Amino acid sequence: MMAAEAGGEEGGPVTAGAAGGGAAAASGAYPAVCRVKIPAALPVAAAAPFPGLAEAGVAATLGGGAALGSGFLGAGSVAGTPGGVGLSAGGAAAGVAGVAAAAAGAGGEMAFAKGTTSLPTETFGAGGGFPPLPPPPPQLPTLGAGLGTVDEGDSLDGPEYEEEEVAIPLTAPPTNQWYHGKLDRTIAEERLRQAGKSGSYLIRESDRRPGSFVLSFLSQTNVVNHFRIIAMCGDYYIGGRRFSSLSDLIGYYSHVSCLLKGEKLLYPVAPPEPVEDRRRVRAILPYTKVPDTDEISFLKGDMFIVHNELEDGWMWVTNLRTDEQGLIVEDLVEEVGREEDPHEGKIWFHGKISKQEAYNLLMTVGQACSFLVRPSDNTPGDYSLYFRTSENIQRFKICPTPNNQFMMGGRYYNSIGDIIDHYRKEQIVEGYYLKEPVPMQDQEQVLNDAVDGKEIYNTIRRKTKDAFYKNIVKKGYLLKKGKGKRWKNLYFILEGSDAQLIYFESEKRATKPKGLIDLSVCSVYVVHDSLFGRPNCFQIVVQHFSEEHYIFYFAGETPEQAEDWMKGLQAFCNLRKSSPGTSNKRLRQVSSLILHIEEAHKLPVKHFTNPYCNIYLNSVQVAKTHAREGQNPVWSEEFVFDDLPPDINRFEITLSNKTKKSKDPDILFMRCQLSRLQKGHATDEWFLLSSHIPLKGIEPGSLRVRARYSMEKIMPEEEYSEFKELILQKELHVVYALSHVCGQDRTLLASILLKIFLHEKLESLLLCTLNDREISMEDEATTLFRATTLASTLMEQSMKATATQFVHHALKDSILRIMESKQSCELSPSKLEKNEDVNTNLAHLLNILSELVEKIFMASEILPPTLRYIYGCLQKSVQHKWPTNTTMRTRVVSGFVFLRLICPAILNPRMFNIISDSPSPIAARTLTLVAKSVQNLANLVEFGAKEPYMEGVNPFIKSNKHRMIMFLDELGNVPELPDTTEHSRTDLCRDLAALHEICVAHSDELRTLSNERGAQQHVLKKLLAITELLQQKQNQYTKTNDVR
């Protein structure tokens, strides 16, 4: 309260805590009423005038007492003033040693003997009283600590963070204590070293990148570290974390998270003098925004702070009158000079009116509790706050201080805005609070009225907002993982000049980002399909700060899209860049790792019932296995990690126990340095496990892992010409030999061969020849293609690579309907809920099957013609081998199309990118029943005694058998190999280098084989000779050039 009176008996008690009891008392910090005996000899400066409390002709008494924030009374210290109570009034002061008093409420009063002036006391608010001590750091969990854990249902929220700005209440010193404006690195380092304390910091505008900022920090090792801060459309990004202000960024790294390991921001370093370098502009014409854009409407005379100068004359600004942010165009504004008051544009500031005009405004436009601020007439540089009560108008002086604060009534604030905010909550005069400011009137605006508005508006209409980001290397939509299991489709721009990945809600609103990632401090890692149960995922890991890993997850619609984005991002990631002079343009080097998690032995019974493994590269999780039962689980799962970032030096595997919790803790772990593995050779080893938790004498067990680490040195394509020619020979002697010696590397071999033959448009030769060989070697029609061979693996990979559009067209609508439905299709008596109607469930299942099968039958033309030609070749081959088996031509195609493509997509639609989220238990069960029914239809088999509850589907199978036969026959009805214009997107040099690496790894087996095989002997010996020659050339490249 700014005006109050109280009387007290000389030497009597002081009472603190009148109106309202006070916030501090309510919190239990100290009693609402505190009594302290004041000596009678206390000198009082009440008779002295208080300049700054009331200006001529206006009565106002201001209070400057203090509330004790620590919750106790200490002799000799009040509100942080050692030695007694300090009261300041225009140079007059009174202090008493060893006396303490506390006021407990907004209405509290302190009474002094022999005085008529009352000094009301108030609890500290934001900026009130003497500068308060900073609050203790919030007790928050450390972000991004160590190895993350996940549950089987893709809850990876631990190491991940969202694009939303940090929403934790943050406190920071005032801007003028740490912001230095435009400053070069050398001077920044000098100022920090002069401060002499580790933990000292400042923020400066970058001298190298105008418009961006740098946080300079003196570490415990006496090294000055510089952290880039990107300013974009009013937000501030460091690494990838977004803040709405630089003050919030300072508060976060002061109280919540470390900037370097174990080091937070501690001591702000102030500039030699205050810095006000923000560009300000004023509207010379009014403007109304275009709907559904990021533009803002404004009035003539509105003042703006410019945050970003975008392309084609657009600017991102804050309107000081409305606090609204958005786009304006420079044609509608004029520059505001440095000489103009920095408060110009605030809705409450009136810099061009006289004292009398201020009175008139408040009396005519304002109401009781209205206010405005204008420059002081008596003291240049000071300000006066004019406040209207129901009876009169009062004025209060606001004085800037040498330490860049503002004083009003003996209290210090970081800004005039803080003063206004304070007295919106606290009484400024007894019974009154600040409410609505009186805005500037039209007659106050000093503008050039001779502006040709018509021409300017016409110019604006011709401007485009499509080119805000000029150096766009890549753009398009990607899925980004949000909290929990949500994936959202967002619009991304890869900006090349500043190495930034910027993303937006949509392409239409691609102005203010939803988020921004500074790629210069990032690395890109692959994400295996197993981690989220969906393909085409990758992650960007921020690795520049103390938080070990800061992760963003993304997914492409297709493997090609994900690969394109990863390659584009890697080119701008700091960790992927070669040092000058270390790279050889003629020789590339790519590392890959294949892990087979085989089994575990003697896991602790107490801790494991359903164990699964989490796989990390360094400390970044990239994959996980399924959960298995027991203490000796067998997984036999393969994980391929291609094109590893160059900083990867180890893999880690942790073991967790699957529970119903959202996250399962890591219990056991093993680590293996890649340098231990012989390059190009498979290692099969039992690793002893270590424990994250005390096992109390129990042995942790062991884990069997097969690992193959390869480092491909890729030479120019012409070096592989003879090698390629030998592989592509139509007899496929090299392919047959490699399939014989590469049993454990079958999947890798198939992937490499398919890419090479696709590039040469010879995939049909490869697949048809291998399929024919498989058919010729099989005696029993019923077991054809049941085993996993190179031929079946190649067919499966080929379908997944080329038939995605067919799968989506045939299945997506029905699967989405299943996902949305709450109706069960359960038919099994053991799984039916109580009172559940099986007939209703069956009708729902048959309805789904009818819709789904109809879509599949109608989608035959969408299958790639080359794949259909291969199906036709299969049909001809089996007809020739088993001429009397009339169903074989149908079943050989269904075995691939349904068993290896359509039914797996129905069972796990996330793996085929049909859905983003995991299906509910009802939906998952429905998908299983649908897949079983479709597979039986494709096999032309009805349900029988094994699953009698499914017999209700048999009429559907019978009625659709003939259509299924016609559909499968039609798929193979492409008698001639079609011409294709599609160009393969493979990296031929790398694929040839990878195949050469396999030949080197299996050279001993190939040499043995070359001595046994008659017809292949010549070809295999030539292969061995070429393999050796390529190895010698590779060594020559390595010796003559340093390869990173």
Curated annotation (Swiss-Prot):
Domain (SH2) ranges: 178-269, 348-438
Residue ranges of domain SH3 in the record: 276-338
Post-translational modification: Phosphorylated by SRC and LCK. The phosphorylation SRC inhibits its ability to stimulate the Ras-GTPase activity, whereas phosphorylation by LCK does not display any effect on stimulation activity.
Domain C2: 574-687
Pfam families tied to this protein: C2, PH, RasGAP, SH2, SH3_1
PROSITE patterns per record: C2, PH_DOMAIN, RAS_GTPASE_ACTIV_1, RAS_GTPASE_ACTIV_2, SH2, SH3
Extent of the Sequence repeats: 646-664, 665-683
Modification type N-acetylmethionine: residues: 1
Modification Phosphoserine, positions: 828
GO molecular function: GTPase activator activity; GTPase binding; signaling receptor binding
CC per GO annotation: cytoplasm
Domain Ras-GAP: 761-971
Residues recorded as bearing Phosphotyrosine in the entry: 612
Function: Inhibitory regulator of the Ras-cyclic AMP pathway. Stimulates the GTPase of normal but not oncogenic Ras p21.
Oligomeric and partner information: Interacts with SQSTM1. Interacts with SPSB1; the interaction does not promote degradation. Interacts with CAV2 (tyrosine phosphorylated form). Directly interacts with NCK1. Interacts with PDGFRB (tyrosine phosphorylated). Interacts (via SH2 domain) with the 'Tyr-9' phosphorylated form of PDPK1. Interacts with tyrosine-phosphorylated EPHB4.
Name of the protein this chain belongs to: Ras GTPase-activating protein 1
